[in-house]
């Protein structure tokens, strides 16, 4: 349960999912929403992330940040996407742990489900078939 006076950090607040989270939080009356764009915080920089979290002391983190692109870009730059996204995830999750954040919600990608998955996708379909390359 997120209390009305909780400090909430939304990593990836400029993306599709992050914007929706911010919109919903504001609609529900949350006032202490923390966000930082790439110019203010490089999520691939472990030290910067830890400093940011220790300074801001969020009660909750929504991890919706990721390097994204289309299927063509994902295929062409596979290692780059994997490296940057793993760095973001590791830095935010470890930074949350080291700075004492008690609640973190990590949002994954639909690409971990089979590319021809029956709709609507069920959680049990996770990694049960061929994925997008």
Locations of the language-model features?
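Residues at the starts of beta-strands that form the adenosine-phosphate
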Residues: 7, 31-32, 102-103
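SDR active-site strand-loop-helix element
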Residues: 11, 36, 61-67, 104-109
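Short, well-ordered alpha-helices that flank and scaffold nucleotide-derived cofactor binding pockets
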Residues: 23-27, 54, 94-98
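NAD(P)H-binding glycine-rich loop region in Rossmannoid oxidoreductase-like domains
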Residues: 46-86, 98
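Adenosine-cofactor binding site in Rossmann-like domains, unifying the SAM/SAH pocket
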Residues: 26-52
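N-terminal Rossmann NAD(P)H-binding glycine-rich loop of SDR-like oxidoreductase domains
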Residues: 2-28
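Catalytic helix-loop patch of NAD(P)-dependent Rossmann-fold dehydrogenases
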Residues: 76-94, 98, 102-103, 111-133
